[in-house]
Every structure is written in structure tokens, then in C-alpha cells.
Amino acid sequence: MSSTATQPRYSLNRKVAVMGYPHVGKSSIVQRFTQNMFPDRYETTIEDQHTKHHTAFHRDFNLRVTDTAGQQEYTVFPRSCSLDVAGFLLVYAIDDRKSFDICSSIYEKIISVYGDPSIPIIIVGNKCDLGTQRVVQQEEGKELAKQCEAKFVEITARETNRVNEVFELLLREIEISRGNLRGPPQQQTKEQTSSDPNDPKNCVIS
């Protein structure tokens, strides 16, 4: 009688970076994903590194997440965003016009440093639970993503499932770009709405 040994699963190492203007909720997004917590007070981020073991697409990942310090003007690219970064979340807040306007400059800086316009990037409109304070419309975010040939999402860092979906979307784009997954993924828009503009259901992933 013969037996077949089960092949051990190995983890894929991937490094991603979260970038954006100050006070847009980058750290809240990272902490929600890596620690399943939402910070109850704001603390200025110098720069943090987080690690999470995550399973998606029948694969195990050791995901290193760099929470970069927000810059008023992205004249200096963060040193932590070395060439081994596989993908980016580019975050703005829907209640902060300046944070949205600077996204184009950050995107151009990323492409300039990496020299690869196809590097996976997700445009993330955060704080979609603050609907009554919105100054950046969803269509503007979608148009920016179209110009950058990137995916677009609106989320609130208060909702674990939404944040997890964003990181899985980025991982999927990374694996497709490396030929490890068939792509593109099925194009769809997940959108839920309610009559309350501050309801976190008023968010979109497309």
C-alpha cells in the first residue's frame, strides 16, 4: 500500500504601501486590516510597518504593509517604498478636496520612481460614512482611476469587510500582473445605498 504525502503550502511574500495626504485615514485602514481595530484618536504617523498572514485565492500570503507618513506635497518619495513594493493603495478622504487633488501628483511620482505604469494601484476614497460632509463625488474618483488605469473603491475604515476586500483586490491585481492568476477578474460594481448619507453602506467597490 502506498500513500501520497500532502504537499506543504508555502506563503508568498508580498509588500504593499499605503500612500496619501495627511489625515485621510491611512493608518486606520492599515490597522483595521492587520489588527481588526479602529483607532479612537488620531496620532501622526511617521512611518509604520505591519505584517499579516492572509489567505486569498487558495494561496497563503505573508503581507507586509507600509503605512507611510502623509505629506503635504510629495516632493520626496518615502524611502520605505523601495522597488520591492508590489502594489499601492492611494488614499484620499471624500471630505477633503486637497487630499483628492494631490492624488494625481502621488500617482505620477510612483510611476516616475518605478518606471512601470502597470504597477498595481487602487484608488481609495475613504470616510464614505461621512456622506453629509462629502466634497469629492464618486464619479470624480472613478474618473481619476480611469485616467490612472487603476481600480477604484470607496470605503470606510470602520468596516472590516470593506477594508479586507480592498486589500484582496490589490492582491488580486498583483497576482494577475505576475501571471499567477488568470485575469482580468470579473468586472462588477458592489454598491449599497441607504437614505442616510452617513450610512457606511453608501460605499462602492468597482
UniProtKB/Swiss-Prot annotation:
Main location: membrane
Family annotation (Gene3D superfamilies): P-loop containing nucleotide triphosphate hydrolases
EC number: 3.6.5.-
Bilayer topology: Lipid-anchor
Lipid attachment site numbers (S-farnesyl cysteine): C203
Molecular functions (GO terms): GDP binding; GTP binding; GTPase activity; metal ion binding
Catalysis: reaction(s): GTP + H2O = GDP + phosphate + H(+)
Family under the similarity heading: Belongs to the small GTPase superfamily. Rheb family.
Function per UniProt: Binds GTP and exhibits intrinsic GTPase activity.
Database matches in PANTHER family: RAS, DI-RAS, AND RHEB FAMILY MEMBERS OF SMALL GTPASE SUPERFAMILY
Descriptive protein name: GTP-binding protein Rheb homolog 1
Organism: Caenorhabditis briggsae
The encoding gene: rheb-1
